C-alpha cells in the first residue's frame, strides 16, 4: 500500500514516453509535482501543457551535447527543479521520476542515475526541518500486454515503500 501520511517519490523504468507518467499519476492516491525533460517544456505543442501542469524541467547530458543550453544554465535549472520537487515531496505530494530506460523500441537498462535519490534525500531534509513525516521511495514496475500497440493493456505495479529514516538525513546540511 502507498503511504498516505507523507510525500513519496515514485521511481520507474521509462519505456513508453508520455504514457508512463500519466498511468502512474492516474493510479496514485496523491497530488503530484512533476519533473520532466527540459525539451518537453520548450517544445511548441507540449510546452503549452507542461507549463500549465508546472512541470519542473531537468536538463540531461544529451540536451547539453545538442546545445540546448550552457552547462551553467543547466546547473541552475536542475538545482531549481530539484528544490521545487523536493519541497513538494516534503509537503506530502507524490512525484515520479524516470532515471533509466529509453523508448519502448530500445528498452534496455542504462547506467544508473542519482537524481531521484538526491531529490528524495533533499525532500527528507526539508521534511525533517519542518517537522513533517520523512518521504518514501516507491519502486514501480510498468507492464504492457503489447507495448508496441497503441491502447494496449497496462499494469502499474507499486513495490513496497522504501522509507527514509532519521539516520539517513544529517542534522546539518
Annotate each predicted stretch with a short phrase.
Residues 1-171:
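Soluble catalytic domains of membrane acyltransferases
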